From Swiss-Prot:
ATP-dependent transporter of the ATP-binding cassette (ABC) family that binds and hydrolyzes ATP to enable active transport of various substrates including many drugs, toxicants and endogenous compound across cell membranes. Transports a wide variety of conjugated organic anions such as sulfate-, glucuronide- and glutathione (GSH)-conjugates of endo- and xenobiotics substrates. Mediates hepatobiliary excretion of mono- and bis-glucuronidated bilirubin molecules and therefore play an important role in bilirubin detoxification. It is found in: Apical cell membrane. Residues 263-283 have a biased composition (Polar residues). InterPro entries: AAA+_ATPase, ABC1_TM_dom, ABC1_TM_sf, ABC_transporter-like_ATP-bd, ABC_transporter_C-like, MRP, P-loop_NTPase, TMD0_ABC. NCBIfam families: MRP_assoc_pro (TIGR00957). The keyword Transmembrane applies. It comes from Mus musculus (Mouse). Residues 908-917 have a biased composition (Low complexity). Expressed in liver. This is ATP-binding cassette sub-family C member 2.
Length: 1543
């Protein structure tokens, strides 16, 4: 090589001088060829990747041109260099070959760079990481030649002037190109710039600067956050996961079958049952739940296992592999620093060492820590994004599974439990994925630590290793116990959330009956168990952490003791001690993290089991539902038998039924006859026993309990279909919605609350019907859609929509109905009884047969009178009038005084005119509605007052208020906080003492000139060192245990306050707040306060005191370091402050964007039969994926913000290491080896601690947001006090007299009055019927009596007491209501009747007897203890309503309110309820709100409401003779006098 350069290639003597240098030949060959070799080796792979990308997006940009121009300049410089070499080669002097080869190599290299840059610009448009690495390598290798040439020039050597100038210019160009490579092309895309960021920008996360700057200037909004790349979106992830999951799940199912065969267990043993909201109601009661409970616990053990983790690994193996490589590289570099520390101590101790050696060590130490930081942060980015994508995949997969889950499988999961899978379990998997590599990395680090410690201390290390081995089984036992507790705690969380879901769903019933304390006690009882388990969990976890924190200290004490005791020649000097201490510090991290990761894996394994069971459950089996295109029947049942549960008898038995296309078929039957089950079977919601159903065409479905989405009325009706104005107007007119839309603020753009909370029952049903009518389906399945509407509205809807001349005429219509007066108009009637068809045929055929139908018809006619006989008039003018508003008294002609024939004819003419004016009014409403819709679309910013119901979730901005920290610390307890801090301070005082004592111990050897000191001195050193180490552990244990108890009390306090306040919130709060949003507080936020926040606070305190103690020790050893610490501290704090605003707001956005995911899921599950019937699963899935992606982009941005900060703060830590090393080199003559070891061993530790402090600071502020969100709901305005000092007499109300004095009320302050000056007197024991069209204010009147709505003026006086002056529970506890929607809660029947256990069993059985349920309940195996499923879904609507009657009979208050209680039941159940009320409440005041006029014709008085005012009030006889609005309504119902109806 000497001949190649014509100079010396290598000379070791050049390094043995104060001014060492490398030979120029070495610099011009090896250091030139290293970067060029790197480029040429990787170039083929790079070009192949570019070729494979196949995307042609070439664009000439300034950056591209600038880089190409500078490379061309380098090309020109290489050409000049070559030409100069050729010019110099005159033959007289020998030109060394290096002069030719290097320019030629550079010429080829720069040409290759030009090609690569051009190709990347065409195809990838992202700077190459390997080109950036090439420029960095080239500059690093060139720096040696750079300084050699400068030295030569300084020595006046002009022989190389030309070459030197060319080199300097070339070096400058390379620096410029590297700087240009750090920038990326600007993009107009809404996606994060990470996809197009340069290599340097990627590793430093500089592409995120703009977001941090934006977040610092003003609080970030969702629009400010970059969108995520397509491959990270839910649709892309689930698509890939689904493919892999299907294969692995199939294998797992096969393995399950093999297991079952081996254990000789029958697969039929699995327990299933009814699902939630099956077709919204069931006429079948599933018996013997108790029998199946035992089976269920056994069955849940048998499900496909061990497939989820495999499927996730196969889905994300590329990212896992990349993060593995980065972590491996980081771990290897981690062990270079102890060796460099050893060399640096040796350098300081050696007085003859050259200064440049020390500087090299300092630079190497800085370089190693810097590269470590880059590797670590890139590794973290990969892992956290992996965790995010795993969570997204799980959430999206759970949602997707919910759309296809079979009813038998779905029954095992309540909405609350499934939301838990999406929120808690997916989060557990995300957490464990973030740190999954630590499982092998910790083992590797422990192994390498032991290896290097062996090199330092020899076999003595085995004593320490032995101790670690002994502690492994202890940790294993603790970990097993932790898992068991975790499993139990997850069950407790599920139970608590299940009850919370029910409470929030039935909050109105709780308020009506003043049952909040009972349900609060139930939640608190579960919460108590949950906190007890949480305490045990935290105690075991603390002991585990204590053992692992103490392990490195004990290991170092034992190792050093054994080392100095086994051989008197073994001297503990600074090099051995502090190199070992640095290795022990490295060992501390894996030993601390390994149990935490194992604990996370254990927790995640519980979640994996739960997810495997759910995702592995059976899907709907639709094989028995055959959809055909060419068939002469619309629907055909062929020997069809279906069941809700395979363990029970078939609900639908051997049904044979043919329905022709275009037919209107009515399905009738008594309660529990199987009407809704027949429909559910058609929809594929039931299990097939045998036979099949053939269906031709698409289906539209109207459920018995209307399912309404949270959105506008228009959105609900369109239901994803395109808007056709003419069709839309026809539908809303036909469904009698025009008057309602006129009254609603915003018209059809008015927002409907969750589950249609701000609509009346009738309005909900009509919106549900309009949704189906708007769809262009072939078959319409209508499950009693007319039950909740007024008689005249029902007739209008039948004529305009369902009947022979309605919008759906010509379509196949299957109508389940209790309104028998429509039956003469249908094509065929199907009579069901006990799941079989008793009779079928036309109305006339069945009447002629004189069978079951004819017999029941006559029975009902006796009870219902002319209303039942009324046929539907097809006169179009009258139909138009039916949907009009009730005419006011002024509209009735003055001469209508008597009911003579002449007057009747006159009235008919008046009615005809009224109908025509009603028709005109309908048209004017239609036009006004159009205007409203257009205005709403064109001027979205001008929101009509009251149009917006659901409030947008409030997002706090700016720094978390100090009051929130105080709120939490107050809950923790100030004394507890003081003692926790004291113990942490004592822990670190002991830590500093340990380091100082070790420093003094190592200095003994230097004082003794390398010989061993006296045994007594040695023993004292060992004893004190060990005592200080143990003291550290004891103080840490004390602080941790104290914090556990304190934080548990904080959790208990916050949950109690939250629950209490939510239960005391007024109904207006629940009207405007989605359930999912409230549940999120009880699920995610409470979980954070329980688990995450206490751990984060403990970690923050450890990190904070760790850094303070380290800096104190460094400053004690080298006081001059204070000068460096000040600017570095300012930089550290400023960067953190700069960042924290962004991180904090992103966490808030994360929390806010989570709620819609869960709300949408709850909404989807409750409306699954409708969604599946309309085949809209894909649309709902896309909507869910969109909401998940919105949340994802906040999470991704937050993850990146952490990396952005960490890389900058680690740079601060690395500078501390560099400055410490540099100062030690500069002041080496005044320092000893133990001081150097003492300073640097702590400085090396600070980088990691600084990083953790930043993360913990961010985590504390992030997690304290949970307290902020909980506090937001703790401070929600309460309704009036439950109990006040002014208590009514014990027997109040004694008479039941009710007096309304100019009573006014509105739903919310910004809305208009709904009751406008109601004044009337209701006497004791009077029976008052309240009538009026939908929206007239009937239900509002009920709400006022119970003070669900508070007065806006006037008063209500009951028995001489103003109800506003007493407590709510004193009022509500003395009144009784049978509500419109019969809501039951999960629990036994007894609890549903008497949650406070106030009544004896005898009283309850009597109430059941009077409610006509005694024989039914007595027939149940568990009787009163029979379990009711969530929402009472294992009871039919009729049975639920009878149970509500039982509640009323049991309470037997002096005042009873029936709020349209019989609207959704058949006439038989209606008759039963009316009979009981008439007999049992004869001495009570009864207010009945009814649609069926015959139910109130025996009332003492009737109140007619319209637009919030009383338009008529008097006895039925008076009102009929007045020929006012009530007379018109009675006329429509076929009732002309009180005598015509009998009840």
């Amino acid at each position: 090589m000497d001949e190649f350069c014509n100079s010396t290639f290598w000379n070791l003597s050049l390094l043995k001088s104060p001014e060492a240098d490398l030979p120029l030949c070495f610099e011009q060959t090896v250091l030139v060829w290293i970067p060029l070799g790197f480029l040429w080796l990787l170039a083929p792979w790079q070009l192949y990747r570019i070729y494979r990308s196949r995307t042609k997006r070439f664009a000439i940009t300034k950056f591209y041109l600038a880089k190409q121009v500078f490379v061309v300049c380098l090309l020109i410089l290489a050409a000049i260099d070559l030409s100069l070499a050729l010019t110099e080669d005159t033959g007289q002097a020998t030109i060394p070959p290096v002069k030719y080869t290097n320019p030629i190599l550079y010429l080829c290299t720069w040409l290759l760079v030009l090609v690569i840059q051009h190709c990347r610009q065409c195809c990838i448009q992202k700077n190459s990481w390997f080109l950036s690495m090439f420029w960095i390598l080239s500059l690093l290798c060139g720096i040696f030649q750079f300084q050699t040439l400068i030295r030569a020039l300084l020595q006046d050597s002009k022989s190389n002037m030309t070459y030197s100038c060319l080199f300097f210019v070339s070096y400058g160009f390379q620096i410029v190109i590297l700087i240009l490579s750090a920038f990326s092309e600007s993009s107009d895309s809404t996606h994060a710039p990470s996809a197009t960021a340069s290599f340097l920008s990627s590793v430093t996360f500089s592409w995120y600067d703009s977001t941090v700057l934006k977040g610092y200037k003003h609080p970030l909004t969702i629009e400010d956050v970059w969108d995520i790349e397509e491959n990270l979106k839910a649709k892309s992830l689930t698509s890939k996961f689904k493919t892999i999951m299907t294969k692995d799940l199939q294998k797992a199912r096969q393995a399950l079958q093999r297991r079952l065969k081996k254990s000789q267990q029958s697969p039929e043993g699995t327990s299933h049952g009814l699902t939630k909201k099956q077709s919204q109601s069931q006429d079948v009661l599933v018996l013997e739940d108790s029998k199946k409970k035992k089976k269920k616990s056994e069955a849940t053990k048998d499900f496909p296992k061990s497939w989820l983790v495999k499927a996730l690994f196969k889905t994300f193996y590329v990212v896992i592999l990349k993060s593995f490589i980065l972590k491996l590289a980081h771990d290897i570099l981690l062990f270079l620093n102890p060796q460099l520390l050893k060399f640096l101590i040796g350098f300081v101790k050696d007085p003859d060492s050259y200064p440049w050696v020390g500087y090299i060590y300092a630079i190497l130490m800085f370089s190693v820590t810097l590269i470590q930081s880059f590797f670590l942060q890139c590794y973290f980015q990969f892992c956290f994004v992996l965790g995010m994508t795993v969570r997204t995949t799980i959430i999206a997969s759970v949602y997707k599974k919910a759309l296809t889950l079979s009813n038998l499988a779905r029954r095992q999961y309540t909405i609350g439990e499934t939301v838990n899978l999406m929120s808690v379990d997916s989060q557990k998997l995300m957490d464990v994925t973030n740190y999954i590599h630590l499982l092998w990395s910790s083992v590797l680090q422990i192994a390498l630590s032991i290896f290097f410690l062996w090199r330092e201390l020899g076999p003595s290390i085995l004593a320490g290793v032995g101790l670690m081995v002994l502690l492994v089984p202890v940790n294993g036992v603790l970990a097993t116990k932790i898992r068991k507790i975790q499993v139990q705690n997850m069950k407790n969380k599920d139970k608590r959330l299940k009850i919370m879901n029910e409470i929030l769903s039935g909050i109105k019933i709780l308020k009506y009956f003043a049952w909040e304390p009972s349900f609060k006690e139930q939640v608190n009882s579960i919460r108590k168990k949950e906190l007890r388990n949480l305490l045990r969990f935290s105690q075991l976890q603390t002991i585990l952490i204590f053992i692992l924190h103490l392990t490195p200290t004990l290991v170092s004490v034992i190792t050093f003791s054994v080392y100095v005791l086994v051989d008197s020649q073994n001297v503990l000097n600074a090099e051995k001690a502090f190199t070992s201490i640095t290795l022990f510090n490295i060992l501390r991290f894996p030993l601390a993290m390994l149990p935490m990761v194992i604990s996370s894996v254990i927790q995640a394994s519980v979640s994996v089991d739960r997810l495997e069971q759910y995702l592995g459950s059976d899907d709907l089996d639709l094989s028995a539902i055959r959809h055909v295109c060419h068939f002469d029947k619309a629907v055909q049942f062929s020997e069809a038998s279906f069941t809700w549960d395979r363990d029970l008898e078939a609900t639908i038995q051997d049904v044979n039924l043919d329905i022709k296309p275009g037919q209107l078929v009515a399905v009738v039957g008594t309660v529990g006859s199987g009407k809704s089950s027949l429909i559910s079977a058609m929809l594929g919601e039931m299990e097939n026993v045998h036979g099949h159903i053939t269906i031709k065409g698409s289906i539209a479905y109207v459920p018995q309990q209307a399912w309404i989405q949270n959105g506008t009325i228009k959105d609900n009706i369109l239901f994803g279909s395109e808007y056709d104005e003419k069709k839309y107007q026809r539908v809303i007119e036909a469904c009698a919605l025009l008057p309602d839309l006129e009254m609603l603020p915003g018209g059809d753009m008015a927002e409907i609350g969750e589950k249609g909370i701000n609509l009346s029952g009738g309005q909900k049903h009509r919106v549900s019907l309009a949704r189906a009518t708007y769809q262009d389906a072939d078959i319409y399945i209508l499950d009693d859609p007319l039950s909740a509407v007024d008689t005249h509205v029902g007739k209008h809807i039948f004529n305009k929509v369902v009947g022979p001349n309605g919008l759906l005429s010509g379509k196949t219509r299957i109508l389940v109905t209790h309104g028998i007066h429509f039956l003469p108009q249908v094509d065929e009637i199907v009579v069901l009884g006990k799941g079989t068809i008793l009779e079928k045929g036309s109305y006339s055929d069945l009447m002629d047969k004189k069978g079951v139908f004819a017999k029941n018809w006559k029975t009902f006619m006796k009870h219902s009178g002319p209303e039942g006989e009324a046929t539907v008039d097809n006169d179009s003018e009258e139909e138009d009038g039916d949907c009009g508003l009730i005419p006011t008294v002024e509209e009735i002609p003055d001469d209508a005084a008597s009911l003579t024939m002449r007057r009747e004819n006159s009235l008919r003419r008046t009615l005809s005119r009224s109908s025509r004016s009603g028709s005109r009014r309908g048209k004017s409403l239609k036009s006004s509605l159009k205007i409203k819709s257009v205005n709403a679309l064109n001027k979205k910013e001008e929101v009509v007052k009251g149009q917006k119901l659901i409030k947008k979730e409030f997002v706090e901005t700016g720094k978390v208020k100090f009051s929130i920290y105080l709120k939490y610390l107050q809950a923790v307890g100030w004394w507890s906080l003081l003692f926790i801090v004291i113990f942490y301070v004592l822990n670190y005082v002991a830590f500093i003492g340990t380091n100082l004592w070790l420093s003094a111990w190592t200095s003994d050897s230097e004082k003794q000139n390398g010989t061993d000191n006296s045994p007594s001195q040695r023993d004292m050193r060992i004893g004190v060192f060990g005592a200080l180490g143990i003291a550290q552990g004891i103080f840490l244990l004390s602080s941790s245990l104290w914090s556990i108890y304190a934080c548990r009390n904080a959790s208990k306090t916050l949950h109690r306050q939250l629950l209490t306040n939510i239960l005391r919130a007024p109904m207006s709060f629940f009207d405007t707040t989605p359930t999912g949003r409230i549940v999120n507080r009880f699920a995610g936020d409470i979980s954070t306060v329980d688990d995450t926040l206490p751990q984060t606070l403990r970690s923050w305190l450890l990190c904070f005191f760790g850094i303070v103690s380290t800096l104190v020790m460094i400053c004690m050893a080298t006081p001059i370091f204070i000068i460096i610490i000040i600017p570095l501290s300012i930089l550290y704090v400023s960067v953190q402050v700069f960042y924290v605003a962004t991180s904090r707001q992103l966490r808030r956005l994360d929390s806010v964007t989570k709620s819609p995911i869960y709300s949408h899921f709850s909404e989807t599950v409750s409306g699954l039969p409708v969604i599946r019937a309309f085949e809209h699963q894909q649309r709902f899935l896309a909507n869910s994926e969109k909401q998940i992606d919105t949340n994802q982009k906040c999470v991704f941005s937050w993850i990146t913000s952490n990396r952005w900060l960490a890389i900058r703060l680690e740079l601060v830590g690395n500078l501390i290491v560099f400055c410490s090393a540099l100062l030690l080199v500069i002041y080496k003559n005044s320092l000893t080896g133990d001081t150097v070891g003492f300073v640097l061993s702590n400085a090396l530790n600070i980088t990691q601690t600084l990083n953790w402090l930043v993360r913990m600071t961010s985590e504390v502020e992030t997690n304290i947001v949970a307290v902020e969100r909980i506090n937001e709901y703790i401070n929600v305005d309460n309704e009036a006090p439950w109990v006040t000092d002014k208590k009514p007499p014990a027997d109040w109300p004694k008479k039941g007299e009710i007096q309304f004095n100019n009573y006014q009320v509105r739903y919310r302050p910004e809305l208009d009055l709904v009751l406008k000056g109601i004044t009337c007197n209701i006497k004791s024991t009077e029976k008052v019927g309240v009538v009026g069209r939908t929206g007239a204010g009937k239900s509002s009147l009920t709400n006022c009596l119970f003070r669900i709505l508070e007065s806006a003026g006037g008063q209500i006086i009951i028995d001489g007491i103003d109800i506003a002056s007493i407590g709510l529970h004193d009022l509500r506890g003395r009144l009784t209501i049978i509500p419109q929607d019969p809501i039951l809660f999960s629990g036994n029947l007894r609890m549903n009747l008497d949650p406070f256990n106030k009544y004896s069993d005898e009283e309850i059985w009597r109430a059941l007897e009077l409610a006509h349920l005694k024989s039914f309940v007595a027939g149940l195996q568990l009787g009163l203890l029979h379990e009711v499923t969530e929402g009472g879904d294992n009871l039919s609507i009729g049975q639920r309503q009878l149970l509500c009657l039982g509640r009323a009979v049991l309470r037997k208050s002096k005042i009873l309110v029936l709020d349209e209680a019989t609207a959704a039941v058949d006439l038989e159940t209606d008759s039963l309820i009316q009979t009981t009320i008439r007999n049992e409440f004869s001495q009570c005041t009864v207010i009945t709100i009814a649609h069926r006029l015959h139910t109130i014709m025996d009332s003492d008085k009737i109140m007619v409401l319209d637009s919030g005012k009383i338009v008529e009030y008097g006895s039925p006889e008076e009102l009929l003779s007045n020929m006012g609005p009530f007379y018109l309504m009675a006329k429509e119902a076929g009732i002309e006098s009180v005598n015509h109806t009998e009840l």
